[in-house]
């Protein structure tokens, strides 16, 4: 469990390592969520029972898309003062967190989800025909679902969940609360991703998958 949690933090779930984040699950605990999970050896971590920031999860995808190079998510490119002079931005430095070959091979391992996997129907309905990596996700009771997708140009994640005081199962087509849920990550979450990304997918250059590294195959 420890290695898995540490890898999640390295790839982008950085808030898990912040002191006090375990208080969401134990109000009197000042540990980081990462230490809380590791100390109790909670193997269910890999199934996703803990809250996750969608920006950080998208940053995990961006790390893999960048050949294992983690950079802090930042929407600001440059800042200028009133005189037109550029103002220095103090940002955390980028970091090579896993070998490039490992990141590239994992991106290829995730490349079939939208071809023959659970994300394929949504990709086809949007007319998506570009190489990409993706993963659908659904909670056991269908109370939430999500889709993570990325190319060498973009990375994005979206969730659908019931944020009402009394959450229930969710059903698809149309999306709604229901008694016996059937919402999956490959339905509305994936459809939303492809609807948003298809028009802009090639705006910043050619979309391609990196080669796999034989050391990790």
Where are these regions (language model features)?
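Active-site-adjacent bridging/hinge elements
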Residues: 8-39, 159, 164-172
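Active-site-adjacent helix/loop patches that line small-molecule binding or acyl-intermediate pockets
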Residues: 1-19, 38-66, 109-112
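Short, exposed beta-strand "edge-strand" segments with a Pro/Gly-rich flavor and a Y/T-containing core
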Residues: 15, 26-31, 49-50, 91-98
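A penicillin-recognizing enzyme superfamily signal
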Residues: 51-217
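Polar/charged alpha-helical tracts
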Residues: 6, 28, 34-35, 202, ...
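Short, well-ordered helical secondary-structure segments
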Residues: 32-34, 39-42, 123, 135-137
């Amino acid at each position: 469990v420890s290695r898995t949690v540490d890898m999640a933090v390295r790839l982008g779930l950085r808030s898990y390592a912040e002191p006090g984040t375990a208080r969401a699950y134990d109000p009197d605990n000042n540990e980081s969520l990462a230490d809380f999970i590791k100390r109790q050896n909670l193997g269910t971590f890999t199934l996703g029972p803990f809250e996750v920031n969608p920006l950080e999860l998208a940053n995990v995808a961006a790390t893999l898309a960048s050949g294992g190079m983690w950079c802090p998510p930042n929407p600001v490119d440059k800042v200028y003062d009133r005189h037109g002079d550029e103002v220095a931005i103090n940002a955390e430095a980028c970091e090579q967190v896993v070998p490039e070959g490992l990141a590239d091979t994992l991106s290829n391992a995730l490349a079939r989800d939208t071809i023959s996997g659970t994300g394929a129907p949504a990709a086809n309905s949007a007319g998506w025909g570009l190489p990409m990596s993706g993963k659908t996700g659904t909670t056991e009771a269908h109370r939430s679902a999500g889709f993570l997708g990325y190319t060498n140009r973009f990375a994005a994640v979206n969730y659908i969940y019931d944020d009402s005081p009394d959450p229930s199962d969710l059903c698809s087509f149309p999306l709604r609360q229901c008694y016996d849920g059937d919402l999956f990550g490959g339905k509305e979450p994936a459809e939303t991703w492809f609807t948003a990304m298809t028009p802009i997918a090639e705006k910043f250059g050619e979309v391609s998958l990196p080669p796999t590294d034989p050391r990790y195959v």
